[in-house]
Amino acid sequence: MTNTTTDEIRVMTSGAFTAAYLELIPQLELLIKKKLVTAATSIGTGENSIPNRLRRGEPVDVVIVADAVLVGFIKDGLIMGDSHTPLARSAIGMAVRAGAPKPDLGTVAALKRTLLEAKSIAHSASVSGDYLTTELVQRLGIADQVLSKTRLIGHGERVGAVIARGEAEIGFQQISELLPVAGIDHVTPLPAEVQKIAVFSAGVAASTTNPEAARAIVRFLGSPEAARAITDSGLEPIAPLKLSSAG
């Protein structure tokens, strides 16, 4: 499949980078003098996940996903290897419904207690959810007690939205995906000893019909000019923040 018009650049981004990317759209459109068409979705296994959309041959120019996933796309010939650009580091956090009691996450022991005491736990269908269910609870020695209480949130829905509706007591996702959601509180990172930092990267699709504009987008997202929006979204930019020369 090919893009219907070269006046549009299509971007697929996973949830963790979405808030920063949306903030930067006006600058990006000014830079490339084209309209951006965005699909904000997950890197899970659902029908509309980024991996499945790419493999179906949906038109796309730029892809933003967890670094390990992007490397896999490069190996599969879906992304141009020389366009691989790390953008930001992302931490996993926990949230509760606004007004609910705020569990302690200050230590590993406190996190373990919070997981054991929670009646229901929501997690994403991507990096943070995989870590919670396949590594963290095993490392804490509580998999048997906790996994039966977990609920996978798929189809591109934010974990925070499920928490805000009261459908789960606590939820885990990338902090940058929790922060924009109304109706939740106490967005708190995991303790450093058990935190899993994910790097999110961008690349140009091998099928792009406008490689020049696509590469310009990737370069800008990885530059100091994009760092403020990345920081404000709850991520840590790879590129250093561009300091103002004023004053």
Task: Set out the residue ranges of the language-model regions.
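Exported/periplasmic ABC-transporter solute-binding proteins
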Residues: 1-39, 43-48, 52-59, 67-68, ...
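Phosphate-/polyanion-interacting regions in eukaryotic proteins
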Residues: 64
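Central helical "cap/lid" subdomain
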Residues: 81-83
